[in-house]
């Protein structure tokens, strides 16, 4: 509601699945699934996969156990391994943080790397400077 989120550009009502179904998703979309529970995450993911498009990025927050459980359930429901391999989950680059702002930074860095078709490697490893040959 507007009182709780006064600065929100848009407030959407409905189930997670209905909301995702009504959103326009295409090959240029970047999607992050962050809900209040395992079942909602799965329903969002199913709604995205059911659209039969390949967004540039689908990421889902979750522990290794939650992700494995969700993937197993989706495989049992008929979704393919190929579909699930396109999902970035757990999301973000490995920066070993539990701070929300730093986790968000790791997620955005991963999305940027995907957008730019890069790996997220350290620049010092990509553009090596040979210190031994400076003299």
What are these regions (language model features)?
Residues 9, 29, 87:
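Short, conserved active-site loop motifs that form the nucleotide-linked donor/cofactor pocket
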Residues 9-15:
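Conserved SAM-binding strand-loop segment of SAM-dependent methyltransferases
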Residues 1-7:
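NAD(P)-binding Rossmann-fold cofactor-contacting core
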Residues 1, 18-19, 38-40:
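Short, catalytically relevant binding-site loops at active-site mouths
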Residues 17-27:
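Short amphipathic alpha-helix with an adjacent loop that forms part of the alpha/beta core around
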Residues 30, 35-38, 46-73:
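ADP-ribose/adenylate-binding Rossmann-like module
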Residues 61-135:
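Adenosine-phosphate binding glycine-rich loop
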């Amino acid at each position: 509601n507007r009182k709780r989120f006064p600065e929100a550009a848009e407030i959407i009502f409905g189930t997670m699945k209905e909301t995702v179904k009504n959103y326009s998703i295409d090959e240029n979309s970047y999607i992050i699934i962050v809900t209040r529970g395992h079942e909602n995450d799965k329903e969002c993911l199913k709604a995205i996969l059911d659209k039969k498009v390949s967004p540039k990025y689908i990421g889902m927050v979750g522990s290794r156990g939650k992700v494995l459980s969700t993937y197993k359930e989706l495989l049992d429901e008929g979704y393919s391994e190929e579909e699930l391999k396109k999902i970035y989950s757990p999301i973000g680059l490995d920066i070993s943080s539990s701070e929300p702002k730093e986790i968000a930074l790791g997620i955005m860095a991963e999305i940027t790397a995907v957008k730019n078709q890069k790996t997220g490697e350290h620049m010092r490893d990509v553009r090596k400077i040979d210190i031994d040959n400076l003299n």
